[in-house]
């Protein structure tokens, strides 16, 4: 189902809310929602650190929730909104779930499986191709990632300072 720009913006803002959940837990802040007939049927945010599971990416969580909602592994007639270009693993899962439409915010230059490094969702050698739109609220999506990495650098500085204080009692 095609969505208006206003509707797309709303759904990407919902994905950003999911990303914020990850940011609050010091997880890489990526958020995702899956929409069918104008209704969010799956939500997810990165939870690898919290779960100690490498596959707990936002897209994987949203796909699992949408599968449960639909009672089907095929997510036909859905649109996946995600703040950052899906990685290779998530791109494969999107294809396997038969999601026909993906809209992402910012590109993923290090791990992108849609455009940046690989083109899994549009590869003609595969049996399922996905319509992809990119750049929706890209600045907002990139900004939350920049906030995460800035906070990480600040945490490292504080940790180094505390270690130095503990090791040098005469400072």
Swiss-Prot record:
PROSITE patterns: CYT_DCMP_DEAMINASES_1, CYT_DCMP_DEAMINASES_2. GO terms for molecular function: tRNA-specific adenosine-34 deaminase activity; zinc ion binding. Residues 6-133 form the CMP/dCMP-type deaminase domain. It catalyses: adenosine(34) in tRNA + H2O + H(+) = inosine(34) in tRNA + NH4(+). The active site is at residue 59. Its cofactor is Zn(2+). CDD domains: nucleoside_deaminase. It is an enzyme of class 3 (hydrolase). Its EC number is 3.5.4.33. Binds 1 zinc ion per subunit. Keywords: Hydrolase, Metal-binding, tRNA processing, Zinc. Gene3D superfamilies: Cytidine Deaminase, domain 2 (3.40.140.10). Zn(2+) binds at residues 57, 87, 90. The keyword Secreted does not apply. InterPro entries: APOBEC/CMP_deaminase_Zn-bd, CMP_dCMP_dom, Cytidine_deaminase-like, tRNA_aden_deaminase. Homodimer. Belongs to the cytidine and deoxycytidylate deaminase family. Catalyzes the deamination of adenosine to inosine at the wobble position 34 of tRNA(Arg2). This is tRNA-specific adenosine deaminase. It comes from Streptococcus pyogenes serotype M1.
